[in-house]
Amino acid sequence: MTYRRGSQSTTALVGCSLDVPEGGWASLLGPSGCGKSTLLRILSDIVKPTSGKASLGGRSPAQARAERAFALVSQQSVMLPWRKLLANVELGLEVMRTPKAERRRRAEEAIEQVGLAGFERAYPFELSGGMRQRAAIARALTLRPRFLLLDEPFGALDELTRERLNFELLRILTETSATMLLVTHSISEAIILSDTVAVMSARPGRISHVAQIDFGHDRSAAMRDDPRFSAYEAELRHAIGGEPQRHAA
């Protein structure tokens, strides 16, 4: 799959195929520059490939966008500084010309869902980084997407906040039944948040390894103490090329 930037054509992805069942959770891992974020931008119809094709639920990215089938959350929360939290969360619905009463109801519901009730009138500068990312997820949830595309949404946060938000996101995914595709550099985050972890090789990116994470959808922080967690970490680190694979005794 190639795409063009100005006069330069770049082959970003080769033979990338990953099937995620409806309601499933999948992550993409791999070295910087391997095409993980490019794949997400192609799926969200931001970048148009000049060869190859991509699909979401059997629809082209353009069709999926027209049907509002997906929502994208990136590492930058992109909140308008002059709008309060509630107004920022309503923004996507406002662009869609959703009636005011309906967008207010859906925004308040999403704010409650991400644990920000009581902060509706706060400006972005009054919120922590973790709270701003939760607001970005709330804005995505107001669209009621079938597919939630996440491009390192917690990458700029400290480790403790990141892990707490991982488990909050698990709760939200369970409640909404959305299908999730996450781009991350964190092996532990991929294990916590995924049923399927796909490892991508260096550019041109291809899926070189797929691991099935057998923890079910009822997860908690205790999963870190499960011997399987360490085994998955070793498997994925080996697949990325970080170190030889070790097997638990």
Write out the residue ranges for each language-model feature.
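A short, flexible loop at the N-terminus of ABC-type nucleotide-binding domains that lies
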Residues: 2-15
